[in-house]
Amino acid sequence: MSCVNIRGCCIGEGRPKVIIPIVEPTETAILEKAAEFSTLRADCVEWRIDCFKGAKSLPAIVHCAAKLRVVLKDQLLLFTFRTKAEGGKVALAHEEYLHFIRTVLATDCADLIDIEFFTVGAELPALIEEAHTAGAAVVCSSHDFHKTPPRAELVSRMVAMQQAGADLPKLAVMPQSRTDVLELLAATAEMADRHPETPIITMSMGALGAVSRLSGEALGSAMTFANPGQASAPGQVSLEVVNEVLDALHL
């Protein structure tokens, strides 16, 4: 598997890198949480902007982003606006979403930016190129909170993300059975073995899929989301447990 190197952090090499989400509603609370997170054992902080009360105010986002970058120092910062269609808090029209992405890129504060595969559609390659020009790596994401598609579909979706230029294809799906969890894990291993051009991030959500958040080094998922006190998705495991298990399973 190839490696994405950001601020000396090699994503795709060794132990999966740990992401912890900020989901607070106000700038004050966000910055307080960031100061707390800067002392924790985590590689990356995700700002879930759709949880921010100013989510539809671009000036408020820009103002908070600049302060957040300073507080986190050299900790990786991932910007995410999870749309309502993909499990987030706020609905955005297509043009609003594109404008948001471009506004965040212009701040020069993002190490990584989440771009939703289906939300952007045909404009994905051009938007990824814009992100790279701005110096941000792209997490290209797809979420299904209802089911787990067949393995072939999961693999083809991640390959399409790679072909569009994404640095880190990401899939999150909901299992309805143990077999669904195995489908996601098998798709992850297949991608890592047969399409190692980029690292990938995968997870099977909910309690049933929690094993997928902990087995990344062996099966091919380069990053995992942990719960530092407040989860941003179903099935996130506590940061303490994630670190303990990743250490125990380190190859």
What is the predicted role of each segment?
Residues 112, 117-251:
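Catalytic alpha/beta core domains of metabolic enzymes, predominantly
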Residues 6-7:
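Glycine-/acidic-rich phosphate or pyrophosphate-binding loops and their flanking alpha/beta elements
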